[in-house]
A protein has these predicted regions:
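Conserved alpha/beta core of the MobA/IspD/sugar-nucleotide pyrophosphorylase nucleotidyltransferase superfamily
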Residues: 187-266
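A short, N-terminal amphipathic alpha-helix
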Residues: 36-55
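Short, glycine-/small-residue-rich phosphate/pyrophosphate-handling segment
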Residues: 173-192
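Conserved donor-nucleotide/metal-binding helix-loop-beta segment in metal-dependent transferases, i.e.
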Residues: 125-160
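Short beta-strand/loop segment that forms part of the nucleotide-sugar
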Residues: 54-63
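Short phosphate-binding loop-to-helix
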Residues: 69-116
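Short aromatic-hydrophobic micro-motifs that form the base-stacking/packing surface
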Residues: 117-121
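N-terminal nucleotide-binding beta1-loop-alpha1 segment
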Residues: 1-23
Length: 266
């Protein structure tokens, strides 16, 4: 089975990415700092994807994004020549954009499809591990053999009932309609699972990967990245997002936990 990895991202631009991390939206970063963080994170994610063997790596960016700026940014990726293709989404809701990107690669199973399975990742996953991607691909291969049609779907959850990774085969009866935007108050992950159960799709999960959208996410991810850095000294299979960590140091971000009040102990 031919696999594609698709990094789904906005073109980084100050004031347009990670705005909920900025002071104007109640956050702690300037627009330039938030943009610098996102740039670093996207490059780290793509770097990690490019270390996975036997897959094609694609990048899908927002329709209104500046392609020249993105091309310039991608020159900073080690092995950028390995990126098979870069294309814009078609606009619309996030559901629409995800569906367009999926169809662009899988082409509804047509002979001119670009892959037999696609795994989509966000650009804001600082703790992304190569072994997590490899596990998702392996599970897609295994699960697809459980169905006469080759259908299979794998997801990796993130905070607040969302997911940060989703992979599916070209014959999987799944679409993103109402997954991220619905009027019923159903979380994205719940909606995904509802569709999987309804269609009886062979289904698997990989480890949770937090994204970074709001200040509390920063407070959570910083200790995790330090833990990854320490773990890599004894386990070279651990992926450390060097650019993102350097950016955090440049900004001067540190975590702090208030000690509990005495009457809250015991």
């Amino acid at each position: 089975m031919k696999h594609a990895l698709l990094v789904f991202t906005k073109v980084p631009k100050a004031g347009e990415v990670k705005t909920r991390l900025t002071e104007d939206r109640g956050g702690i970063l300037t627009p330039e700092e938030a943009n610098g963080f996102y740039e670093s994170c996207v490059l780290d994610v793509i770097d990690t994807c490019l270390t996975v063997e036997g897959v094609d790596v694609w990048v899908c960016y927002n329709k209104d994004g500046n392609r020249a700026d993105l091309d310039g940014l991608l020159q900073g990726v080690k092995g950028s020549e390995k990126i098979v293709g870069v294309f814009p989404d078609a606009g619309g809701s996030f559901d629409d954009c995800m569906q367009y990107a999926t169809d662009y690669i899988l082409k509804n199973g047509a002979e001119d499809r670009l892959a037999d399975a696609v795994t989509i990742l966000g650009g804001d996953l600082p703790s992304l591990q190569r072994k997590t991607i490899e596990e998702a691909i392996s599970k897609l291969d295994r699960l697809s053999k459980l169905s006469a049609t080759g259908a299979a779907l794998v997801q990796g959850a993130c905070q607040e009932g969302g997911f940060s990774l989703v992979g599916l085969t070209t014959s999987t009866p799944f679409d993103f309609h109402k997954v991220f935007y619905n009027m019923d108050g159903i979380t994205a992950l719940d909606m995904l699972v509802n569709k999987v159960v309804e269609e009886n799709i062979p289904f698997g999960t990989v480890e949770m990967m937090p994204d970074v959208d709001i200040p509390v996410d920063l407070a959570s991810i910083l200790p995790l990245l330090r833990a990854l850095e320490a773990a890599q000294k004894n386990d070279p299979s651990v992926t450390v997002p060097r650019r993102t960590m350097e950016k955090f140091k440049e900004i001067g971000l540190e975590t702090f936990a208030f000690p509990p009040h005495r009457d809250e102990i015991g």
